């Protein structure tokens, strides 16, 4: 009987210790990043508080959400609104540039006196979230940065994460010699005069092939190696010539960072027409969505085309 009582006491102590350890672990895991602390103004919360968006399995991520970042100038606040109340200009922009997108949520950004400053619209495009900011008239301003939970307080990425390519190692580049025969044959049969110059693979296993032929083209093949899009990224008679990012002007770098925060640079070309420089064509990755951005000779953004 004495041994039984001792064993019961030991078991009880072990259970108490285990509960304590679980409580300690839960407390450690529940600590939220500093950027998630909320400052409220009535029903609105601080515009700089990250917005959680469900991933629905994109990129085979272990986490179930990403977080949309908003850098506020001054004291600004965010209110969720019905997406149908977004300006017509916003809805048209998204329909034209993100075909077959699904609207997820929408917000207004206002100052403490309630003056409208901008709109934020979050959509799902190609099974991934895209967050866009527009000014108070509905004109496009920027593609907002996304981060995973673990990266809210660091530089926005970690190896093995959804946004690991922000480390600049260009692991998405495909060796042209290793392009699948199905893609090579398709390009040869359908665009025989095109010269393939680059290729990239997305996290959805799509392959983007960049080709040149009196202009530039982005050819998107899905994971089944079927052509999904053939997009002109440089007008006819436009001759493309490689340019390094190190040759970008300060103004160009600033405009890219302001419009695509924490973007990934893939490559760039000078655009020449009849020997005259028309600016640059820049291919970037913003939150795993690919864009072809054109800028003038002064580094001002002229257009951005959604590639995939």
Where in this protein do the model-derived segments appear?
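Sec-dependent N-terminal signal peptides
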Residues: 7-16
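A short, surface-exposed beta-strand/turn
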Residues: 129-147, 216-234, 289-307
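Exposed beta-strand-loop-beta-strand "reactive/processing" segments of non-cytosolic proteins
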Residues: 100-134, 193-220, 266-294, 307-308
